[in-house]
Amino acid sequence: AVEAXKTYVRDKPI
């Protein structure tokens, strides 16, 4: 998923 232009994996920020 992608939120606020940031890349997420399994709904956890990386």
From Swiss-Prot:
Gene Ontology terms for molecular function: GTP binding; GTPase activity; magnesium ion binding; translation elongation factor activity
Enzyme Commission number, as recorded: 3.6.5.3
Catalysed reactions, as listed in the record: GTP + H2O = GDP + phosphate + H(+)
GO annotation, biological process: translational elongation
Gene Ontology terms: cellular component: mitochondrion
Compartment annotation: Mitochondrion
Keyword field contains Hydrolase: yes
Enzyme class: hydrolase
Similarity-based family: Belongs to the GTP-binding elongation factor family. EF-Tu/EF-1A subfamily.
Function as written in the Swiss-Prot or TrEMBL entry: GTP hydrolase that promotes the GTP-dependent binding of aminoacyl-tRNA to the A-site of ribosomes during protein biosynthesis.
Protein name: Elongation factor Tu, mitochondrial
Annotated organism of origin: Canis lupus familiaris
Lineage: Eukaryota, Metazoa, Chordata, Craniata, Vertebrata
